[in-house]
């Protein structure tokens, strides 16, 4: 930062801004700024000379902004517009003083949900946010992640001044088969991955905000494809068939009772079982979505889309899936939003509103209208299976890979082994609910925690033995997938049937010296996953200690919270164990990374979340080499640089260290 503001100070400021978000700030320095700072006082502190802040101040002074203590949804057009006005202001700040002052000022004046969203995306996308770790959202807005019963207990603990730790149970009862896999969709780490991915790659993003989000449309496909495939793996582990796709003209079989409440706005609406889709006032008619879908199918059949100027763009080429992802999600990158609509975003709102489609009961938005809560609803995965099948139709239109396409000449994978057993178990995790309850003037905060059960696994290491028969060292890309062998009825799947259900476990780049070599890779280094984020309490302590001690703070290991949680890398499996195929494909790293600058140690979570502000580090299609049809699996088995072995995953009901 030009003013030399260190990471420790920035981290402390962000911590203070997000503390007790529904109450006036308790920090004297922020209070003083909020009362005395004039956002329009000196417009030289903004890159746009104050244009963005002028717009927001006009809305504020004309009393047009959403009031505080009201629900907020990103899918609500007006509310999103307001949050993005604040994002635009923070994004135009030249220095931290400007960022912090505006944040402190608008925190006291704007809707809390809009403020939190704008602050999070600003820290993620602004250069000023580098080095800051955003606290886990489940501690900032706990209502979105914790059921009402536990929140009520937290309130009574606060009132009676008794410390407490309360168990969060998964939604539903044993009468509901879907409850068997609730631990996946309701996992707070998985919720954070989903909401953060959509903050890293927002559908509202325009390049005028500062840079281009590389392969955003393709990543939209791949991240949701992987979430759906992982959900199907968990279903397989619980004796359930893969999730069915959604149909606009058939009933929605599974209802959903979220049993969670907004901080302000009442309970999340319930959707009963077996209802037909209804038109939603002010959103869309069911028929509109059917038309949108048929236009997308038509584009895939023709092999081209039509842009808003009437020109055709070929999609039977490597960038085709990117263009398709942009029009299906409908991000601002869509080539023709007028014609292709906004299938994904509209469908989220349609599903969210089925409990009150005509606004008769004035219910707040449903869980599907928030990325934080969407994966809790079984219909989320049905919706994404439906979209996934549209993408599959596109990828199936490409010719299968040939031996020459797949071969990495001179590179032989001789064997793949796992060092250690593949064991999964459930463990317990606690998070603080202090931000869920209001502070009274004379009531001290007491320690109140929620305790959740989370899927975890023992760490393991891949051992890949290989021979590099080329005349020197070669850069290689290692692509590791886990694939089902049988379906839920015990019928063996062909590779062509299984490939679409495979989950990505890792993708990394490594130099392989000439001759025989053994590559070892720990499961915790996976580029698909992220470690547990530090708690809000820990972030506050670390930042305060650093600021008070006058030293800096390096939290770079936690800067990205986009990624599958480390502990959920493996599917749960069954107590008696399940066998899966582990595929390792080693491809030519020089070709894969051609045109990318810098080293090849892309730590973090580049596989599904890219590299922040840079081009995606791998030129191959996401999912390569399993993303295209495989009519003859001998082609895959016939290349020396791809190997698969059978591995067994066992679920331990008791957790043994």
From Swiss-Prot:
Function (record text): Hemocyanins are copper-containing oxygen carriers occurring freely dissolved in the hemolymph of many mollusks and arthropods.
Tissue expression pattern: Hemolymph.
Gene Ontology CC, one term: extracellular region
Pfam families with a match to the protein in the record: Hemocyanin_C, Hemocyanin_M, Hemocyanin_N
Intrachain disulfide bonds: 93-98, 483-502, 562-609
Location(s) in or outside the cell: Secreted, Extracellular space
Binding of Cu cation B, residues: 344, 348, 384
UniProt keywords, alphabetically: Copper, Disulfide bond, Glycoprotein, Metal-binding, Oxygen transport, Secreted, Transport
An example molecular function term from Gene Ontology annotations: oxygen carrier activity
Chain sites annotated for binding Cu cation A: 194, 198, 224
Sequence segments annotated as region (Disordered): 594-616
Keyword Nucleus: no
PROSITE patterns listed in its UniProt record: HEMOCYANIN_1, HEMOCYANIN_2, TYROSINASE_2
Family: Belongs to the tyrosinase family. Hemocyanin subfamily.
Glycosylation sites recorded in the entry for this protein: 167
Source species: Panulirus interruptus
Assembly: Hexamer of a number of different chains, of which A, B, and C have been identified.
Source lineage: Eukaryota, Metazoa, Ecdysozoa, Arthropoda, Crustacea
Protein name: Hemocyanin A chain
